[in-house]
């Protein structure tokens, strides 16, 4: 009922205390908080409810009332980064993340990561990358804010989330990489999906095998046809073809795929695995180096935080490589 939701909001609000607020957003006057299941159980339940609704609407999800798993509730849990709309007192969206230097290892020496059931991590990655990496997952925008009817609040929900990630790189100066997944759904056109995956592999494929899918998803479309289609050396020219061809099929390139591609020219793509416990969605592993994020995005999401919080530079000893680049 509406009354119950309203009470939920009041309990949420009490848990979203000032000490958990990370920053204000660049756009839409929203607020970003970092919480855990342990310090904000009601907010966690609301995140789980909203996540499940958003993922299920797209063809994923757990099939339960709430999407909350062991990684959300374990002893050293994933942290939840949420965008809060203070006017409507609602959560607009979120990510969950775990800092690489806080990752635990099981008795077999495997990292306790939400992606460890889908991807193998090389020794090089575990030793040279993981301690400086943030693993991101469960990125969502609340269903009501996904439509154009939500106006500017909805339009900037993803932008707001990235403000949060930008702030993380400042307050955690050892963070050099973001590791995460681009999700595509089984309902997406197969040939369109194959074009996108071929294009990503051609321009961003990881040659070092830092991370590999345990059961790689195989492209169904004829490789020769894709080779002939994407015949340019430049990302820009091939991208024009991709955009045109996907539209011919009556689809768009998924917004997050587009957004990640435009973050950094040196993004690494690790292949695609199927997430069998989550509606069989197709997860493509990616790694982005923070100091290679394109300048306009860096200014927008990272430097704006420093302007809001000049004291944060003391934490980073005033010599953060991203900001002095």
Task: State where each predicted segment sits.
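Short, solvent-exposed loop/turn elements at beta->coil junctions and helix N-caps
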Residues: 66-72, 272-277
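A short helix-loop-beta-strand connector motif used in the catalytic cores of GNAT acetyltransferases and
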Residues: 72-82, 105, 267-268, 278-284
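Acyl-donor binding region in acyl/amide transferases
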Residues: 62, 66, 102-267, 271
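Short, flexible loop/turn elements at secondary-structure junctions
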Residues: 36-39, 85-88, 96-102, 138-143, ...
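Scaffold helices S1-S3 of the voltage-sensor/voltage-sensor-like domain
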Residues: 75-76, 82-85, 90-120
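Intrinsically disordered, low-complexity, positively biased terminal segments
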Residues: 35, 41, 56, 223, ...
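Single conserved hydrophobic/aromatic residue that forms the stacking wall/gate
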Residues: 1-6, 10
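Short amphipathic alpha-helix that is part of the acyltransferase structural core
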Residues: 24-69, 80-88, 92-99
């Amino acid at each position: 009922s509406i009354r119950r939701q309203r009470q939920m909001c009041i309990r949420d609000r009490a848990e979203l205390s000032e000490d958990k607020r990370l920053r204000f957003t660049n756009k839409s006057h929203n607020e970003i908080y970092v919480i855990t299941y342990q310090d904000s159980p009601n907010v966690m339940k609301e995140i789980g409810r909203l996540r499940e609704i958003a993922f299920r609407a797209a063809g994923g999800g757990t099939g339960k009332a709430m999407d909350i798993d062991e990684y959300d509730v374990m002893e050293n849990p994933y942290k939840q980064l949420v965008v809060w709309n203070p006017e409507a007192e609602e959560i607009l969206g979120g990510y969950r993340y775990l800092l690489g230097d806080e990752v635990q290892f099981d008795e077999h020496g495997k990292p306790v990561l939400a992606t460890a059931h889908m991807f193998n991590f090389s020794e090089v990655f575990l030793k040279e990358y993981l301690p400086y990496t943030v693993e991101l997952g469960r990125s969502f925008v609340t269903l009501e804010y996904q439509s154009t009817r939500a106006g500017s609040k909805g339009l900037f929900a993803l932008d707001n989330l990235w403000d949060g990630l930008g702030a993380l790189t400042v307050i955690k100066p050892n963070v050099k990489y973001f590791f995460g997944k681009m999700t595509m759904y089984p309902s997406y056109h197969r040939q369109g999906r194959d074009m996108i995956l071929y294009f990503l592999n051609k321009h961003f494929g990881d040659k070092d095998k830092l991370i590999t899918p345990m059961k790689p998803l195989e492209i169904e479309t004829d490789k020769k046809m894709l080779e002939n289609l994407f015949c340019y050396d430049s990302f820009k020219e091939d991208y024009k073809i991709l955009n045109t061809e996907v539209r011919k099929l009556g689809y768009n390139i998924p917004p997050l795929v587009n957004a990640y591609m435009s973050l950094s020219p040196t993004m690494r793509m690790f292949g695609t695995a199927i997430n069998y416990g989550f509606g069989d969605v197709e997860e493509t592993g990616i790694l982005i180096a923070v100091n290679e994020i394109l300048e306009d995005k860096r200014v927008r999401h990272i430097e704006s935080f420093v302007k809001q919080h000049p004291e944060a530079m003391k934490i980073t000893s005033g010599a953060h490589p991203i900001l002095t680049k």
